[in-house]
Amino acid sequence: MSVSLVSRNVARKLLLVQLLVVIASGLLFSLKDPFWGVSAISGGLAVFLPNVLFMIFAWRHQAHTPAKGRVAWTFAFGEAFKVLAMLVLLVVALAVLKAVFLPLIVTWVLVLVVQILAPAVINNKG
């Protein structure tokens, strides 16, 4: 199996785990109040959707043989776009949807923690 295929499978698993965390957190917060659940889901999607866009961007550029030094610039551009998209989604959730801050920020942090810890668990072959 090629390295790119392995990294694609790991990325898909990571995105799936993040989506499951968003859904689970939204369901748990909706037990208190349905709007808390919506707020939690919007906080999780503020991390999940930019990650999906970044993965699509990375997969699209993975097929090409880039020029020397271009990989770093492409990665930096994609990461900057991801952070900017996350900030825009958080502002929309707080300003437009009037989301409750606590479930939004808790789910946001949860998905970020999953983003950091899940690759170590996924790659652990035991």
UniProtKB/Swiss-Prot annotation:
It comes from the Bacteria. Keywords: Cell inner membrane, Cell membrane, CF(0), Hydrogen ion transport, Ion transport, Membrane, Transmembrane, Transmembrane helix, Transport. It is a multi-pass membrane protein. Its main location: membrane. Residues 36-37, 95-100 are periplasmic. One of its GO terms (cellular component) is plasma membrane. InterPro entries: ATP_synth_I (IPR005598). Residues 2-14, 59-70, 118-126 are cytoplasmic. It is found in: Cell inner membrane. One of its GO terms (biological process) is proton transmembrane transport. Coiled coil: none annotated. The chain crosses the membrane at residues 15-35, 38-58, 71-94, 101-117. Pfam families: ATP-synt_I. NCBIfam families: PRK08049.1. A possible function for this protein is to guide the assembly of the membrane sector of the ATPase enzyme complex. Belongs to the bacterial AtpI family. This is ATP synthase protein I. It comes from Escherichia coli (strain K12).
